[in-house]
């Protein structure tokens, strides 16, 4: 776990993000979405040239179909899926490619999904 990231996120979540109005929340959300889209344009092969004109929405089927182009870590879907399935069987959740961990969604929709997280992201989730 990244302790500095954990502490920073915990402090921000606990003491610094107090919104006084709906407008303040919406402004914060817009800023965060802009930052996220800038990140995707820089890091995700799928979004390098912006949002495609035919892009409608993101669901599990779309994400799994375009996993290799969407993810920002260069992780191959088939490799990650094999590792995640093996990890589920053995209960050995070894990381893939350094700090990237792989997991599976429960598959309650009938289709299992794949997710990857970095050590930084896991620290932020734990703190929030």
Residue locations for each model-derived region?
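Nucleotide 5′-phosphate-binding alpha/beta core
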Residues: 1-104, 110-127
């Amino acid at each position: 776990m990244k302790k500095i990231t954990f502490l920073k996120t915990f402090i921000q979540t606990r003491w610094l993000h107090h919104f006084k109005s709906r407008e303040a929340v919406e402004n914060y959300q817009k800023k965060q979405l802009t930052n996220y889209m800038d990140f995707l344009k820089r890091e995700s092969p799928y979004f390098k040239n912006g949002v495609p004109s035919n892009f409608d929405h993101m669901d599990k089927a779309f994400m799994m179909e375009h996993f290799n182009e969407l993810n920002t870590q260069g992780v191959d879907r088939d490799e990650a899926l094999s590792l995640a399935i093996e990890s589920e069987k053995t209960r050995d959740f070894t990381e893939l490619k350094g700090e990237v961990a792989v997991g599976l969604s429960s598959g309650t929709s009938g289709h299992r999904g794949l997710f990857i997280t970095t050590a930084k992201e896991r620290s932020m989730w734990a703190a929030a």
